[in-house]
Amino acid sequence: MEVQLGLGRVYPRPPSKTYRGAFQNLFQSVREAIQNPGPRHPEAASIAPPGACLQQRQETSPRRRRRQQHPEDGSPQAHIRGTTGYLALEEEQQPSQQQSASEGHPESGCLPEPGAATAPGKGLPQQPPAPPDQDDSAAPSTLSLLGPTFPGLSSCSADIKDILSEAGTMQLLQQQQQQQQQQQQQQQQQQQQQQEVISEGSSSVRAREATGAPSSSKDSYLGGNSTISDSAKELCKAVSVSMGLGVEALEHLSPGEQLRGDCMYASLLGGPPAVRPTPCAPLAECKGLSLDEGPGKGTEETAEYSSFKGGYAKGLEGESLGCSGSSEAGSSGTLEIPSSLSLYKSGAVDEAAAYQNRDYYNFPLALSGPPHPPPPTHPHARIKLENPSDYGSAWAAAAAQCRYGDLASLHGGSVAGPSTGSPPATASSSWHTLFTAEEGQLYGPGGGGGSSSPSDAGPVAPYGYTRPPQGLASQEGDFSASEVWYPGGVVNRVPYPSPSCVKSEMGPWMENYSGPYGDMRLDSTRDHVLPIDYYFPPQKTCLICGDEASGCHYGALTCGSCKVFFKRAAEGKQKYLCASRNDCTIDKFRRKNCPSCRLRKCYEAGMTLGARKLKKLGNLKLQEEGENSSAGSPTEDPSQKMTVSHIEGYECQPIFLNVLEAIEPGVVCAGHDNNQPDSFAALLSSLNELGERQLVHVVKWAKALPGFRNLHVDDQMAVIQYSWMGLMVFAMGWRSFTNVNSRMLYFAPDLVFNEYRMHKSRMYSQCVRMRHLSQEFGWLQITPQEFLCMKALLLFSIIPVDGLKNQKFFDELRMNYIKELDRIIACKRKNPTSCSRRFYQLTKLLDSVQPIARELHQFTFDLLIKSHMVSVDFPEMMAEIISVQVPKILSGKVKPIYFHTQ
């Protein structure tokens, strides 16, 4: 039967449905009824719904008045709650309209006064059983606990009258209605004076008092020979539920009604609540306890909280609720409560025994339903229950865990009061904190700054806590030593290392970085500007496919596979064509897909058939170490034994030229804003920016030249730092010849110098000489092949006066490039005299570059000194090279190599 709890009315039962909910509304608040015992006004019968006749009667017995004024336990709570332990059933929709009736009217529907219960406060003595001469109406037998039904049928529905007529229990119900109306009227009076909620204490006392007075109505109503129909039993269930003692509860509210805030099970109606283990079959449907703190609760409510809910159930420190009864009694909604069983104990003697049978970490919680209301900040509460519905299905099992911690620290509260179950402050400090306040989640000690409710903090991630070694463990005795536990499937978040744990030096994987820029830091122990790692970082991977390199093969550091491929492709006469756009990806797994792009990449890396092969990468390292150790010894350097075999000549073989064409740098822009007016500072700043960008391309180009990597690393860097200016001037002259026919200086597509800019830059004389160099390309009809070979030879045309570390190898490499230039000339001309004349012209052109480069060195050095005065910007790398290496050239320590006597 479907019944609205605590509202004193009965509703028809839906067909084929039985709602089983929590054991709800056992007792409700009665403080207002005692504090405001104003006159009662009869409620209009016309507006009363069916079952509204369940009201309470004011007590008139002199003995009960004396008991109310002088309670036997002497506690102040006894005076507040009135003469009985029953709590009023509040009429929520019409709290001010209360029906008054006398005991003589059977239609009043009042109930007799049950026996007095124990005090609701924690730690109060138990109420002794009622004396034998006490009124039978005060003996709370099972029948009186359930409460009778309605004998006055004027306000009852026709269906109920038919049911009662068929069952033959009309007279019995009329007798029991009077007792029920008396009971409800007394509870209505107590409702206005007390708002404390007693969980199970009053029921225990009534069970003890049941032994003092027999109940004849119980025997007659529930006897073995009873012929009451199922419909009558359903009606009994409804009345029992209205009294708060039934095992079946209504789960749906009628429209316009709200759930009471002070109901024990108010927060459990949203979904299937937690089930408390109990051996009693009739209580199998009983759910966990929960109390929500109402706004009007007094500060004296310091009862201990139970562990059944994320909310807080008070007064449960004694034994678990026990009951006995057959399945018949369970089906009829009655409860057999032994008189010897106490439902509430005030002492703390049996606290440990009460908690031994509880499983604090494996409550069967609901996986759906609305979120729980925010728990109050209470110094005695130590339960933090996470709702599994806040997580996904993967977290459901892990989330259904009860987490313990000091509630005051958990919710950031500062409430401190007397508490028997509150742990020391150090208990919360042992929590395993994985979340911080910035993440918007409460986890671990909340120390302020965190949110005080789950709604503010959001769903708490299901990470484990550290169980407090003190606090509840000292009371219940079932906690082991503190240990960090994590639910299944939860991986701990990796924390960021502290600064003391951060490794400052680079690891081995960083040392092998083969990027084009390498390490930009300077080495103060050397006299050069940039470290060798900037230009030539240590290479341990194949330059072609990225696989592990086995050595330097054919002038480049490659693996064995690329070594064999290059040998077969370079020596063979087969021509490879790319099926795509000559931009195929060549790596360890796709190096065999396109032989054409792989061969092109080999040429770009500097591989040539005539280059000297090093046996292994380790041998090169040992040779370099030997050079450093024997730099001052008269013994011959091991690296000097290396000889560079001459590049085998062949008639117009394009392999060498193909390499030079493949590695030629692309177009580089200066980033100059041509919309701004030309000025000295703007033009020179753009030139310096262009010089730094081109220097990066020069480094890449030089490293790809055949045989260049066989030089000593210090020699490689020195050659680039001394010859970069001549290389840029020579390349700019070629661009000016090919793009603007040498009429202007084509530094970059966005930076072209005409006569006006030449004057504006204050380097007109240098610009005139560079333009004259560009015109020489036209006068001599320089071919692209000749330009590429001359540019490569220009790289090896300036050295220090004291020589390089491996001067002999440098001289041999330079001679090979000179011979290549001679072969290129000979490919076009059959007459030896013509070849000699052409060779003379080209070498004279190379010699003319060196004076121009020297003038530019002097100009840039002077400009760097007074750059702060003229507001000219110098990039960092350009400024360092000019300040360190250019003075060596200007002072004569570094001199160019001329083909002809100057």
Swiss-Prot record:
Biased composition (Low complexity): 94-103
Phosphoserine PTM positions: S61, S75, S254, S290, S633
Tissue: Highest levels in the seminal vesicle, ventral prostate and coagulating gland with lower levels in the kidney and levator ani muscle.
Binding site for 17beta-hydroxy-5alpha-androstan-3-one: N688, R735, T860
Region (Interaction with HIPK3): 554-644
Zn-finger segments (NR C4-type): 542-562, 578-602
Keywords on record: Cytoplasm, Disease variant, DNA-binding, Isopeptide bond, Lipid-binding, Lipoprotein, Metal-binding, Nucleus, Palmitate, Phosphoprotein, Receptor, Steroid-binding, Transcription, Transcription regulation, Ubl conjugation, Zinc, Zinc-finger
Subunit record text: Binds DNA as a homodimer. Part of a ternary complex containing AR, EFCAB6/DJBP and PARK7. Interacts with HIPK3 and NR0B2 in the presence of androgen. The ligand binding domain interacts with KAT7/HBO1 in the presence of dihydrotestosterone. Interacts with EFCAB6/DJBP, PQBP1, RANBP9, RBAK, SPDEF, SRA1, TGFB1I1, ZNF318 and RREB1. Interacts with ZMIZ1/ZIMP10 and ZMIZ2/ZMIP7 which both enhance its transactivation activity. Interacts with SLC30A9 and RAD54L2/ARIP4. Interacts with MACROD1 (via macro domain).
Function: Steroid hormone receptors are ligand-activated transcription factors that regulate eukaryotic gene expression and affect cellular proliferation and differentiation in target tissues. Transcription factor activity is modulated by bound coactivator and corepressor proteins like ZBTB7A that recruits NCOR1 and NCOR2 to the androgen response elements/ARE on target genes, negatively regulating androgen receptor signaling and androgen-induced cell proliferation. Transcription activation is also down-regulated by NR0B2. Activated, but not phosphorylated, by HIPK3 and ZIPK/DAPK3.
Designated name of the protein: Androgen receptor
Upper classification of the organism: Eukaryota, Metazoa, Chordata, Craniata, Vertebrata
